[in-house]
Amino acid sequence: MNISAVFNALLVSIMAAVLWKHVKLLEQFYVIEEELELTRQSQELSQVRIDYQAALQALVEDGTRMVCSGRMHTDRVCRFESLCYSTEAEEFVFFHSNSSIMLPNLGPRRFQPALLDLSSVDDHNTQYFNFIELPAAALKFMPKPVFVPDVALIMNRFNPDNLMHVFHDDLIPIFYTIQQFADLDFESRLFFMEGWNEGLHFELYKFMSNKQPLLKEQLKTLGRLLCFTKSYVGLSKITTWYQYGFVQPQGPKANILVSGNEIRHFAKFMMGKLNITKDQNAAEAYIVLFSRSMNRLIVNEAELLLALAQEFQMKTITVSLEDHSFADIVRLISNATMLVSMHGAQLITSLFLPKGAIVVELFPYGVNPEHYTPYKTLSTLPGMELQYVAWQNTEEENTIAYPNRPWEQGGIVHLDKTEQERIKKSKEVPRHLCCRNPEWLFRIYQDTKVNISSLIQVIKSKTKLGSRRQKWTQGLYPGKVRESKCQASAQGTGEAKLFVSWQIPWNLKFLKVRDVKYEVWIQEQGENSYMPYILSQQNYTFSENIKPLTTYLVWIRCIFNKTLLGPFAEVLVCNT
Protein backbone atom coordinates (compact mmCIF):
# COMPACT_ATOMS: atom_id res chain seq x y z
CA MET A 1 0.00 0.00 0.00
CA ASN A 2 1.52 3.33 -1.02
CA ILE A 3 1.56 6.34 1.21
CA SER A 4 -0.83 8.24 -1.09
CA ALA A 5 -3.59 5.67 -0.58
CA VAL A 6 -3.09 5.73 3.18
CA PHE A 7 -3.24 9.48 3.17
CA ASN A 8 -6.41 9.51 1.06
CA ALA A 9 -8.08 6.98 3.36
CA LEU A 10 -7.14 9.03 6.41
CA LEU A 11 -8.41 12.19 4.72
CA VAL A 12 -11.73 10.52 3.88
CA SER A 13 -12.11 9.38 7.50
CA ILE A 14 -11.39 12.87 8.79
CA MET A 15 -13.80 14.41 6.27
CA ALA A 16 -16.50 11.89 7.23
CA ALA A 17 -16.03 12.66 10.92
CA VAL A 18 -16.17 16.40 10.28
CA LEU A 19 -19.21 16.00 8.05
CA TRP A 20 -20.98 13.78 10.64
CA LYS A 21 -20.26 16.33 13.36
CA HIS A 22 -21.54 19.10 11.08
CA VAL A 23 -24.75 17.15 10.39
CA LYS A 24 -25.28 16.52 14.10
CA LEU A 25 -24.66 20.19 14.87
CA LEU A 26 -27.10 21.12 12.09
CA GLU A 27 -29.69 18.70 13.50
CA GLN A 28 -29.20 20.15 16.97
CA PHE A 29 -29.53 23.64 15.51
CA TYR A 30 -32.82 22.70 13.84
CA VAL A 31 -34.10 21.15 17.09
CA ILE A 32 -33.19 24.28 19.03
CA GLU A 33 -34.72 26.45 16.30
CA GLU A 34 -37.92 24.36 16.38
CA GLU A 35 -38.10 24.56 20.17
CA LEU A 36 -37.59 28.32 20.01
CA GLU A 37 -40.39 28.55 17.45
CA LEU A 38 -42.68 26.41 19.62
CA THR A 39 -41.78 28.53 22.63
CA ARG A 40 -42.57 31.62 20.55
CA GLN A 41 -45.95 30.14 19.62
CA SER A 42 -46.64 29.52 23.30
CA GLN A 43 -45.64 33.12 24.04
CA GLU A 44 -48.10 34.31 21.37
CA LEU A 45 -50.85 32.63 23.39
CA SER A 46 -49.82 34.10 26.71
CA GLN A 47 -47.41 36.43 28.44
CA VAL A 48 -46.61 33.59 30.83
CA ARG A 49 -43.07 32.39 30.08
CA ILE A 50 -42.59 28.67 29.66
CA ASP A 51 -39.48 26.48 29.82
CA TYR A 52 -40.15 24.36 26.75
CA GLN A 53 -37.72 21.53 27.58
CA ALA A 54 -39.03 21.24 31.14
CA ALA A 55 -42.64 21.22 29.91
CA LEU A 56 -41.89 18.55 27.31
CA GLN A 57 -40.04 16.40 29.84
CA ALA A 58 -42.94 16.69 32.29
CA LEU A 59 -45.39 15.62 29.59
CA VAL A 60 -43.28 12.58 28.63
CA GLU A 61 -42.58 11.50 32.22
CA ASP A 62 -45.84 12.41 33.95
CA GLY A 63 -48.32 12.04 31.10
CA THR A 64 -51.83 13.43 31.48
CA ARG A 65 -53.58 13.69 34.84
CA MET A 66 -57.33 14.00 35.33
CA VAL A 67 -59.55 14.39 38.41
CA CYS A 68 -63.28 15.02 37.96
CA SER A 69 -66.13 16.17 40.17
CA GLY A 70 -69.64 14.81 39.66
CA ARG A 71 -70.99 11.27 39.48
CA MET A 72 -72.60 11.32 36.03
CA HIS A 73 -71.59 12.79 32.68
CA THR A 74 -74.41 15.31 33.07
CA ASP A 75 -72.95 16.90 36.22
CA ARG A 76 -69.22 16.34 35.70
CA VAL A 77 -66.45 18.93 35.37
CA CYS A 78 -62.87 17.64 35.00
CA ARG A 79 -59.52 19.18 35.90
CA PHE A 80 -56.62 18.14 33.67
CA GLU A 81 -52.89 18.58 33.69
CA SER A 82 -51.25 18.13 30.28
CA LEU A 83 -54.41 17.41 28.28
CA CYS A 84 -53.51 17.71 24.60
CA TYR A 85 -55.48 18.43 21.43
CA SER A 86 -54.62 17.35 17.89
CA THR A 87 -55.80 20.05 15.49
CA GLU A 88 -55.38 17.62 12.58
CA ALA A 89 -57.47 14.81 14.07
CA GLU A 90 -59.70 17.26 16.00
CA GLU A 91 -59.38 14.97 19.02
CA PHE A 92 -58.32 15.51 22.61
CA VAL A 93 -55.50 13.19 23.67
CA PHE A 94 -54.78 11.64 27.07
CA PHE A 95 -51.11 10.55 27.23
CA HIS A 96 -50.48 7.63 29.58
CA SER A 97 -47.33 7.27 31.65
CA ASN A 98 -46.58 5.52 34.92
CA SER A 99 -47.47 8.77 36.69
CA SER A 100 -50.81 9.38 34.95
CA ILE A 101 -54.00 9.74 37.01
CA MET A 102 -57.53 9.16 35.71
CA LEU A 103 -60.33 9.69 38.22
CA PRO A 104 -62.94 8.45 37.74
CA ASN A 105 -61.46 5.51 35.88
CA LEU A 106 -64.59 4.44 34.04
CA GLY A 107 -63.19 2.02 31.50
CA PRO A 108 -65.70 1.48 28.68
CA ARG A 109 -68.38 3.34 30.66
CA ARG A 110 -66.61 6.51 29.53
CA PHE A 111 -68.36 5.99 26.19
CA GLN A 112 -71.85 5.45 27.64
CA PRO A 113 -72.45 8.01 26.29
CA ALA A 114 -69.54 10.32 27.23
CA LEU A 115 -67.19 11.46 29.96
CA LEU A 116 -69.03 14.78 30.31
CA ASP A 117 -71.14 17.44 28.60
CA LEU A 118 -69.11 20.29 27.13
CA SER A 119 -72.04 22.70 27.46
CA SER A 120 -74.46 23.41 30.29
CA VAL A 121 -77.33 21.78 28.35
CA ASP A 122 -78.08 18.36 29.79
CA ASP A 123 -77.21 15.23 27.82
CA HIS A 124 -77.34 16.66 24.29
CA ASN A 125 -75.59 14.34 21.86
CA THR A 126 -73.87 17.21 20.04
CA GLN A 127 -72.22 18.39 23.27
CA TYR A 128 -70.40 15.26 24.47
CA PHE A 129 -66.71 15.32 25.41
CA ASN A 130 -64.22 12.47 25.32
CA PHE A 131 -60.58 11.86 24.48
CA ILE A 132 -58.45 9.23 22.79
CA GLU A 133 -55.63 7.52 24.71
CA LEU A 134 -51.98 7.11 23.72
CA PRO A 135 -48.81 6.06 25.54
CA ALA A 136 -46.53 8.99 26.30
CA ALA A 137 -43.87 7.22 24.23
CA ALA A 138 -45.98 8.00 21.13
CA LEU A 139 -44.90 11.64 21.47
CA LYS A 140 -41.63 10.67 19.74
CA PHE A 141 -43.58 10.07 16.53
CA MET A 142 -45.92 13.04 16.74
CA PRO A 143 -45.56 16.75 15.97
CA LYS A 144 -43.74 18.67 18.65
CA PRO A 145 -46.38 20.04 21.06
CA VAL A 146 -47.14 23.71 21.53
CA PHE A 147 -47.80 24.30 25.23
CA VAL A 148 -50.66 26.52 26.40
CA PRO A 149 -49.42 28.07 29.67
CA ASP A 150 -52.72 29.78 30.59
CA VAL A 151 -55.21 27.97 32.79
CA ALA A 152 -57.86 26.99 30.26
CA LEU A 153 -61.63 26.59 30.54
CA ILE A 154 -62.65 24.33 27.66
CA MET A 155 -66.35 24.28 26.76
CA ASN A 156 -69.01 24.53 24.08
CA ARG A 157 -71.31 27.47 23.53
CA PHE A 158 -74.78 26.11 22.83
CA ASN A 159 -76.25 28.78 20.55
CA PRO A 160 -74.16 31.96 20.49
CA ASP A 161 -76.55 33.83 18.17
CA ASN A 162 -79.49 33.65 20.60
CA LEU A 163 -79.33 36.03 23.56
CA MET A 164 -81.32 33.76 25.90
CA HIS A 165 -78.95 30.86 25.22
CA VAL A 166 -75.90 33.13 25.55
CA PHE A 167 -76.89 34.11 29.09
CA HIS A 168 -78.64 30.99 30.42
CA ASP A 169 -76.40 28.34 28.83
CA ASP A 170 -73.03 30.09 28.64
CA LEU A 171 -72.31 33.34 30.48
CA ILE A 172 -73.92 32.61 33.85
CA PRO A 173 -72.51 29.03 33.96
CA ILE A 174 -69.04 30.33 32.99
CA PHE A 175 -69.21 32.96 35.73
CA TYR A 176 -70.09 30.43 38.43
CA THR A 177 -67.75 27.72 37.14
CA ILE A 178 -64.95 30.26 37.65
CA GLN A 179 -66.23 30.84 41.20
CA GLN A 180 -66.30 27.09 41.88
CA PHE A 181 -62.66 26.23 41.16
CA ALA A 182 -59.73 27.99 42.82
CA ASP A 183 -57.44 27.67 39.77
CA LEU A 184 -59.90 29.53 37.56
CA ASP A 185 -60.15 33.31 37.54
CA PHE A 186 -60.51 36.08 35.02
CA GLU A 187 -56.89 35.54 33.92
CA SER A 188 -57.89 32.10 32.65
CA ARG A 189 -58.54 31.69 28.93
CA LEU A 190 -61.76 30.41 27.38
CA PHE A 191 -61.61 27.86 24.56
CA PHE A 192 -64.85 27.37 22.61
CA MET A 193 -64.85 23.95 20.94
CA GLU A 194 -68.33 23.76 19.37
CA GLY A 195 -67.07 24.99 15.99
CA TRP A 196 -69.24 28.12 15.62
CA ASN A 197 -67.83 31.44 14.46
CA GLU A 198 -67.79 34.37 16.90
CA GLY A 199 -71.53 34.96 16.60
CA LEU A 200 -73.64 38.03 17.28
CA HIS A 201 -72.77 38.48 20.95
CA PHE A 202 -69.05 37.67 21.14
CA GLU A 203 -68.30 40.93 22.94
CA LEU A 204 -70.29 39.64 25.93
CA TYR A 205 -68.12 36.51 26.14
CA LYS A 206 -65.03 38.72 26.34
CA PHE A 207 -66.25 40.03 29.70
CA MET A 208 -65.68 36.57 31.20
CA SER A 209 -61.89 36.69 30.81
CA ASN A 210 -59.18 39.32 30.58
CA LYS A 211 -57.78 37.30 27.67
CA GLN A 212 -59.21 36.87 24.20
CA PRO A 213 -61.36 33.72 23.97
CA LEU A 214 -60.22 31.32 21.26
CA LEU A 215 -62.42 29.43 18.81
CA LYS A 216 -61.86 25.86 17.65
CA GLU A 217 -60.94 27.02 14.14
CA GLN A 218 -58.24 29.36 15.48
CA LEU A 219 -56.40 26.51 17.21
CA LYS A 220 -55.17 25.21 13.84
CA THR A 221 -53.05 28.32 13.43
CA LEU A 222 -51.26 27.66 16.73
CA GLY A 223 -49.85 24.23 16.00
CA ARG A 224 -50.64 20.62 15.13
CA LEU A 225 -50.53 19.38 18.73
CA LEU A 226 -51.57 21.72 21.56
CA CYS A 227 -51.00 20.74 25.18
CA PHE A 228 -52.81 22.57 27.97
CA THR A 229 -50.60 22.70 31.05
CA LYS A 230 -53.70 23.07 33.24
CA SER A 231 -57.31 23.00 32.10
CA TYR A 232 -60.89 22.55 33.22
CA VAL A 233 -63.32 20.87 30.85
CA GLY A 234 -67.09 21.36 31.05
CA LEU A 235 -69.37 23.80 32.83
CA SER A 236 -71.23 23.79 36.11
CA LYS A 237 -74.98 23.46 35.47
CA ILE A 238 -76.01 24.55 38.94
CA THR A 239 -77.29 27.94 37.72
CA THR A 240 -79.54 26.73 34.87
CA TRP A 241 -83.29 26.85 35.44
CA TYR A 242 -84.81 25.72 32.13
CA GLN A 243 -84.78 22.68 29.83
CA TYR A 244 -85.53 23.14 26.14
CA GLY A 245 -87.63 20.10 25.37
CA PHE A 246 -85.21 17.64 23.78
CA VAL A 247 -86.54 14.65 25.74
CA GLN A 248 -89.81 16.00 27.15
CA PRO A 249 -91.73 19.20 26.37
CA GLN A 250 -89.84 22.30 27.49
CA GLY A 251 -90.29 23.71 30.97
CA PRO A 252 -88.54 24.57 34.24
CA LYS A 253 -85.87 22.10 35.34
CA ALA A 254 -87.12 19.54 37.83
CA ASN A 255 -84.56 20.49 40.46
CA ILE A 256 -83.70 24.19 40.26
CA LEU A 257 -80.68 25.01 42.42
CA VAL A 258 -80.19 28.71 41.70
CA SER A 259 -81.90 31.69 43.31
CA GLY A 260 -82.41 35.28 42.27
CA ASN A 261 -79.57 36.25 44.59
CA GLU A 262 -77.01 34.53 42.34
CA ILE A 263 -78.64 35.87 39.17
CA ARG A 264 -78.55 39.42 40.52
CA HIS A 265 -74.93 39.01 41.60
CA PHE A 266 -74.08 38.05 38.02
CA ALA A 267 -76.16 40.96 36.67
CA LYS A 268 -74.18 43.37 38.88
CA PHE A 269 -70.93 41.94 37.50
CA MET A 270 -72.12 42.40 33.91
CA MET A 271 -73.27 45.96 34.58
CA GLY A 272 -69.81 46.73 35.93
CA LYS A 273 -68.25 45.38 32.73
CA LEU A 274 -70.67 47.51 30.70
CA ASN A 275 -69.75 50.60 32.79
CA ILE A 276 -73.32 51.02 33.98
CA THR A 277 -74.04 52.49 37.39
CA LYS A 278 -77.48 51.70 38.72
CA ASP A 279 -79.42 54.84 39.62
CA GLN A 280 -80.88 54.04 43.04
CA ASN A 281 -82.78 57.34 43.09
CA ALA A 282 -84.22 57.38 39.58
CA ALA A 283 -86.44 60.45 39.46
CA GLU A 284 -88.87 59.22 36.82
CA ALA A 285 -90.69 55.91 36.50
CA TYR A 286 -90.89 54.59 32.94
CA ILE A 287 -91.92 51.59 30.86
CA VAL A 288 -89.59 49.88 28.36
CA LEU A 289 -91.16 48.19 25.34
CA PHE A 290 -88.99 45.81 23.33
CA SER A 291 -89.59 46.31 19.63
CA ARG A 292 -88.91 43.60 17.04
CA SER A 293 -88.15 44.45 13.42
CA MET A 294 -88.10 41.11 11.58
CA ASN A 295 -90.88 38.88 12.90
CA ARG A 296 -93.29 38.41 15.79
CA LEU A 297 -94.17 42.08 15.42
CA ILE A 298 -96.64 44.14 17.44
CA VAL A 299 -98.51 45.72 14.53
CA ASN A 300 -100.15 48.43 16.67
CA GLU A 301 -96.99 49.23 18.60
CA ALA A 302 -97.38 53.03 18.50
CA GLU A 303 -100.95 52.79 19.79
CA LEU A 304 -99.82 50.43 22.56
CA LEU A 305 -97.05 52.81 23.65
CA LEU A 306 -99.48 55.70 23.93
CA ALA A 307 -102.06 53.63 25.83
CA LEU A 308 -99.49 52.36 28.37
CA ALA A 309 -98.24 55.90 28.94
CA GLN A 310 -101.76 57.22 29.49
CA GLU A 311 -102.97 54.34 31.67
CA PHE A 312 -99.95 54.18 34.00
CA GLN A 313 -98.94 57.86 33.77
CA MET A 314 -95.38 56.96 32.82
CA LYS A 315 -93.00 57.70 30.01
CA THR A 316 -92.69 54.80 27.54
CA ILE A 317 -89.43 53.98 25.75
CA THR A 318 -88.87 51.54 22.90
CA VAL A 319 -85.64 49.59 22.52
CA SER A 320 -84.52 46.94 20.06
CA LEU A 321 -81.52 44.67 19.65
CA GLU A 322 -81.10 45.99 16.11
CA ASP A 323 -81.05 49.73 16.90
CA HIS A 324 -79.56 49.95 20.39
CA SER A 325 -76.26 48.83 21.86
CA PHE A 326 -76.53 46.15 24.49
CA ALA A 327 -75.12 48.55 27.08
CA ASP A 328 -77.84 51.12 26.29
CA ILE A 329 -80.55 48.45 26.59
CA VAL A 330 -79.26 47.30 29.98
CA ARG A 331 -78.89 50.90 31.18
CA LEU A 332 -82.56 51.57 30.42
CA ILE A 333 -83.89 48.27 31.75
CA SER A 334 -81.92 48.45 34.99
CA ASN A 335 -84.04 51.39 36.17
CA ALA A 336 -87.35 50.55 34.47
CA THR A 337 -90.63 50.05 36.30
CA MET A 338 -92.05 47.73 33.65
CA LEU A 339 -90.67 45.73 30.71
CA VAL A 340 -93.09 44.73 27.93
CA SER A 341 -92.09 42.37 25.14
CA MET A 342 -93.30 39.67 22.81
CA HIS A 343 -92.00 36.23 23.76
CA GLY A 344 -88.40 36.00 22.61
CA ALA A 345 -84.75 35.81 23.57
CA GLN A 346 -84.57 39.55 24.30
CA LEU A 347 -86.58 38.96 27.49
CA ILE A 348 -83.50 37.46 29.15
CA THR A 349 -82.57 41.10 29.79
CA SER A 350 -85.27 41.07 32.50
CA LEU A 351 -82.53 39.78 34.82
CA PHE A 352 -81.28 43.39 34.90
CA LEU A 353 -84.63 44.80 36.12
CA PRO A 354 -84.75 46.27 39.63
CA LYS A 355 -86.62 44.39 42.33
CA GLY A 356 -90.35 45.06 42.30
CA ALA A 357 -90.42 45.72 38.54
CA ILE A 358 -93.03 44.15 36.25
CA VAL A 359 -92.28 41.75 33.37
CA VAL A 360 -95.07 41.59 30.76
CA GLU A 361 -94.62 38.79 28.20
CA LEU A 362 -96.90 38.78 25.15
CA PHE A 363 -97.75 35.57 23.27
CA PRO A 364 -99.18 35.20 19.75
CA TYR A 365 -102.43 33.46 18.94
CA GLY A 366 -102.43 29.72 19.65
CA VAL A 367 -99.33 29.80 21.88
CA ASN A 368 -100.21 28.84 25.46
CA PRO A 369 -98.07 30.90 27.90
CA GLU A 370 -98.05 28.02 30.40
CA HIS A 371 -96.12 25.85 27.92
CA TYR A 372 -93.22 28.29 27.36
CA THR A 373 -91.95 29.69 30.65
CA PRO A 374 -88.19 30.48 30.67
CA TYR A 375 -88.81 34.11 31.63
CA LYS A 376 -91.65 33.37 34.04
CA THR A 377 -89.35 30.87 35.77
CA LEU A 378 -86.56 33.46 35.94
CA SER A 379 -88.89 36.17 37.27
CA THR A 380 -90.26 33.95 40.01
CA LEU A 381 -86.96 32.56 41.31
CA PRO A 382 -86.70 33.24 45.06
CA GLY A 383 -84.90 36.54 45.48
CA MET A 384 -85.58 37.88 41.96
CA GLU A 385 -88.70 39.60 43.30
CA LEU A 386 -90.14 40.53 39.92
CA GLN A 387 -93.84 40.68 39.12
CA TYR A 388 -94.62 38.53 36.07
CA VAL A 389 -97.60 38.84 33.74
CA ALA A 390 -98.36 36.74 30.65
CA TRP A 391 -100.83 37.93 28.02
CA GLN A 392 -101.99 35.81 25.08
CA ASN A 393 -103.76 36.92 21.93
CA THR A 394 -106.97 34.87 21.90
CA GLU A 395 -108.54 36.60 18.87
CA GLU A 396 -107.68 34.97 15.56
CA GLU A 397 -108.63 38.11 13.61
CA ASN A 398 -105.81 39.94 15.44
CA THR A 399 -103.07 37.69 14.11
CA ILE A 400 -101.10 37.77 10.86
CA ALA A 401 -99.55 34.45 9.81
CA TYR A 402 -96.98 33.80 7.09
CA PRO A 403 -97.54 30.31 5.64
CA ASN A 404 -95.42 31.06 2.54
CA ARG A 405 -92.21 31.83 4.40
CA PRO A 406 -89.36 29.29 4.70
CA TRP A 407 -90.12 26.55 7.24
CA GLU A 408 -87.61 27.93 9.78
CA GLN A 409 -89.57 31.22 9.80
CA GLY A 410 -92.94 29.56 10.29
CA GLY A 411 -93.82 28.64 6.72
CA ILE A 412 -95.95 25.53 6.13
CA VAL A 413 -96.28 25.32 2.32
CA HIS A 414 -93.79 22.45 2.29
CA LEU A 415 -96.37 20.31 4.14
CA ASP A 416 -99.22 18.44 2.46
CA LYS A 417 -102.50 20.33 2.10
CA THR A 418 -104.29 18.35 4.81
CA GLU A 419 -101.61 19.14 7.39
CA GLN A 420 -101.56 22.81 6.35
CA GLU A 421 -105.31 23.08 6.88
CA ARG A 422 -105.12 21.32 10.23
CA ILE A 423 -102.46 23.74 11.47
CA LYS A 424 -104.40 26.79 10.26
CA LYS A 425 -107.57 25.63 12.04
CA SER A 426 -105.82 24.65 15.27
CA LYS A 427 -106.64 26.83 18.29
CA GLU A 428 -103.58 25.90 20.38
CA VAL A 429 -100.19 24.39 19.69
CA PRO A 430 -100.05 21.02 21.52
CA ARG A 431 -97.12 20.28 23.82
CA HIS A 432 -94.17 19.23 21.67
CA LEU A 433 -90.46 18.49 21.61
CA CYS A 434 -87.77 20.84 20.36
CA CYS A 435 -87.08 22.14 17.81
CA ARG A 436 -88.76 21.87 14.37
CA ASN A 437 -92.43 21.39 15.15
CA PRO A 438 -94.13 23.13 12.17
CA GLU A 439 -97.25 24.13 14.11
CA TRP A 440 -95.14 25.79 16.81
CA LEU A 441 -93.03 27.66 14.25
CA PHE A 442 -96.14 28.75 12.30
CA ARG A 443 -97.74 30.25 15.40
CA ILE A 444 -94.68 31.72 17.14
CA TYR A 445 -93.65 33.71 14.03
CA GLN A 446 -97.05 35.39 13.67
CA ASP A 447 -97.43 39.14 14.00
CA THR A 448 -99.99 40.34 16.55
CA LYS A 449 -102.39 43.22 16.94
CA VAL A 450 -102.53 43.57 20.71
CA ASN A 451 -105.96 44.00 22.29
CA ILE A 452 -104.85 46.93 24.40
CA SER A 453 -107.77 47.04 26.83
CA SER A 454 -107.38 43.31 27.49
CA LEU A 455 -103.64 43.68 28.11
CA ILE A 456 -104.04 46.63 30.49
CA GLN A 457 -106.73 44.79 32.43
CA VAL A 458 -104.42 41.78 32.87
CA ILE A 459 -101.51 43.97 34.01
CA LYS A 460 -103.63 45.85 36.54
CA SER A 461 -105.24 42.71 37.93
CA LYS A 462 -101.99 40.80 38.45
CA THR A 463 -99.50 43.44 39.56
CA LYS A 464 -99.01 46.26 42.00
CA LEU A 465 -97.10 49.28 40.76
CA GLY A 466 -94.56 50.68 43.18
CA SER A 467 -94.62 47.52 45.28
CA ARG A 468 -92.21 47.50 48.18
CA ARG A 469 -88.86 45.99 47.25
CA GLN A 470 -88.20 43.30 49.78
CA LYS A 471 -84.82 42.50 51.20
CA TRP A 472 -83.10 39.18 50.56
CA THR A 473 -83.45 38.30 54.26
CA GLN A 474 -87.05 37.37 53.43
CA GLY A 475 -85.62 34.23 51.81
CA LEU A 476 -83.46 33.07 54.72
CA TYR A 477 -84.29 29.77 56.39
CA PRO A 478 -84.67 29.01 60.10
CA GLY A 479 -82.13 26.90 61.93
CA LYS A 480 -83.01 24.02 64.25
CA VAL A 481 -85.13 24.67 67.33
CA ARG A 482 -83.05 24.34 70.50
CA GLU A 483 -83.38 22.75 73.93
CA SER A 484 -86.41 20.65 73.07
CA LYS A 485 -87.85 18.70 76.02
CA CYS A 486 -90.82 16.49 76.76
CA GLN A 487 -92.57 15.54 79.99
CA ALA A 488 -95.35 12.98 80.39
CA SER A 489 -98.17 12.90 82.91
CA ALA A 490 -100.69 10.10 83.42
CA GLN A 491 -104.41 10.63 84.02
CA GLY A 492 -105.40 7.32 85.55
CA THR A 493 -104.96 4.11 83.59
CA GLY A 494 -106.54 5.13 80.31
CA GLU A 495 -105.33 8.68 79.65
CA ALA A 496 -102.00 10.47 79.38
CA LYS A 497 -100.62 13.83 78.35
CA LEU A 498 -97.36 14.85 76.72
CA PHE A 499 -95.92 18.31 77.40
CA VAL A 500 -93.36 19.37 74.76
CA SER A 501 -91.33 22.61 74.81
CA TRP A 502 -88.46 24.12 72.83
CA GLN A 503 -86.49 27.34 72.28
CA ILE A 504 -86.43 29.42 69.09
CA PRO A 505 -83.78 28.77 66.42
CA TRP A 506 -80.56 30.62 67.17
CA ASN A 507 -80.68 32.73 63.98
CA LEU A 508 -84.25 33.99 64.57
CA LYS A 509 -83.08 36.68 67.00
CA PHE A 510 -81.11 38.31 64.18
CA LEU A 511 -83.96 38.30 61.63
CA LYS A 512 -87.15 40.25 61.12
CA VAL A 513 -89.67 37.57 60.21
CA ARG A 514 -93.34 38.34 59.79
CA ASP A 515 -94.76 34.88 60.50
CA VAL A 516 -93.12 32.17 62.66
CA LYS A 517 -94.74 28.78 63.15
CA TYR A 518 -93.58 25.40 64.49
CA GLU A 519 -94.38 22.01 63.02
CA VAL A 520 -94.49 19.07 65.45
CA TRP A 521 -94.73 15.41 64.44
CA ILE A 522 -95.66 12.80 67.07
CA GLN A 523 -95.23 9.13 66.21
CA GLU A 524 -95.91 6.11 68.36
CA GLN A 525 -92.79 3.95 68.30
CA GLY A 526 -93.22 1.02 65.94
CA GLU A 527 -95.98 2.70 63.91
CA ASN A 528 -95.64 4.13 60.38
CA SER A 529 -98.10 7.00 60.72
CA TYR A 530 -97.62 10.20 62.71
CA MET A 531 -99.75 13.09 63.99
CA PRO A 532 -98.72 16.52 62.58
CA TYR A 533 -99.41 19.83 64.31
CA ILE A 534 -98.75 23.47 63.33
CA LEU A 535 -98.29 25.70 66.38
CA SER A 536 -97.55 29.36 67.07
CA GLN A 537 -96.16 28.92 70.59
CA GLN A 538 -93.00 27.23 71.87
CA ASN A 539 -94.74 24.67 74.07
CA TYR A 540 -97.87 22.59 73.97
CA THR A 541 -99.58 19.83 75.94
CA PHE A 542 -100.73 17.00 73.68
CA SER A 543 -103.53 14.75 74.88
CA GLU A 544 -105.30 13.56 71.74
CA ASN A 545 -104.44 9.89 71.02
CA ILE A 546 -101.73 9.90 73.71
CA LYS A 547 -101.73 6.58 75.58
CA PRO A 548 -100.10 5.69 78.90
CA LEU A 549 -97.10 3.35 79.09
CA THR A 550 -96.16 4.14 75.48
CA THR A 551 -93.00 5.47 73.81
CA TYR A 552 -93.42 8.40 71.41
CA LEU A 553 -90.96 9.93 68.95
CA VAL A 554 -91.28 13.71 68.55
CA TRP A 555 -89.83 15.86 65.73
CA ILE A 556 -89.97 19.68 65.77
CA ARG A 557 -89.02 22.27 63.16
CA CYS A 558 -89.51 26.00 62.60
CA ILE A 559 -91.28 27.55 59.58
CA PHE A 560 -90.82 31.16 58.40
CA ASN A 561 -93.57 32.87 56.41
CA LYS A 562 -95.41 29.59 55.70
CA THR A 563 -92.96 28.39 53.03
CA LEU A 564 -89.42 28.47 54.47
CA LEU A 565 -89.13 25.12 56.23
CA GLY A 566 -86.20 24.67 58.60
CA PRO A 567 -84.53 21.36 59.51
CA PHE A 568 -86.02 19.05 62.13
CA ALA A 569 -84.21 19.05 65.45
CA GLU A 570 -82.90 15.79 66.89
CA VAL A 571 -85.73 13.39 67.65
CA LEU A 572 -87.15 13.43 71.18
CA VAL A 573 -87.91 10.06 72.77
CA CYS A 574 -90.77 10.48 75.25
CA ASN A 575 -92.23 7.80 77.55
CA THR A 576 -95.67 8.17 79.12
Swiss-Prot record:
Positions on the Lumenal side per record topology: 26-576
EC category name: transferase
Glycosylation sites: 98, 275, 335, 451, 539, 561
Membrane topology: Single-pass type II membrane protein
Cytoplasmic side: 1-4
Pathway: Protein modification; protein glycosylation
Record's GO cellular component terms: endoplasmic reticulum; endoplasmic reticulum membrane
BP-aspect Gene Ontology terms: neuron migration; protein O-linked glycosylation; protein O-linked mannosylation
Keyword set, alphabetical order: Endoplasmic reticulum, Glycoprotein, Glycosyltransferase, Membrane, Signal-anchor, Transferase, Transmembrane, Transmembrane helix
Cytoplasm as UniProt keyword: no
Pfam hit, one: Glyco_transf_61
Subcellular location as annotated: Endoplasmic reticulum membrane
Catalytic activity: 3-O-(alpha-D-mannosyl)-L-threonyl-[protein] + UDP-N-acetyl-alpha-D-glucosamine = 3-O-(N-acetyl-beta-D-glucosaminyl-(1->4)-alpha-D-mannosyl)-L-threonyl-[protein] + UDP + H(+)
Transmembrane segments: 5-25
Ranges of residues in domain Fibronectin type-III: 482-576
EC number: 2.4.1.312
InterPro entries: FN3_dom, FN3_sf, Glyco_transf_61_cat, Glycosyltransferase_61
A molecular function GO annotation: acetylglucosaminyltransferase activity
Role, per record: O-linked mannose beta-1,4-N-acetylglucosaminyltransferase that transfers UDP-N-acetyl-D-glucosamine to the 4-position of the mannose to generate N-acetyl-D-glucosamine-beta-1,4-O-D-mannosylprotein. Involved in the biosynthesis of the phosphorylated O-mannosyl trisaccharide (N-acetylgalactosamine-beta-3-N-acetylglucosamine-beta-4-(phosphate-6-)mannose), a carbohydrate structure present in alpha-dystroglycan (DAG1), which is required for binding laminin G-like domain-containing extracellular proteins with high affinity.
Stated family: Belongs to the glycosyltransferase 61 family.
Protein known as: Protein O-linked-mannose beta-1,4-N-acetylglucosaminyltransferase 2
High-level lineage: Eukaryota, Metazoa, Chordata, Craniata, Vertebrata
Gene expressing this chain: pomgnt2
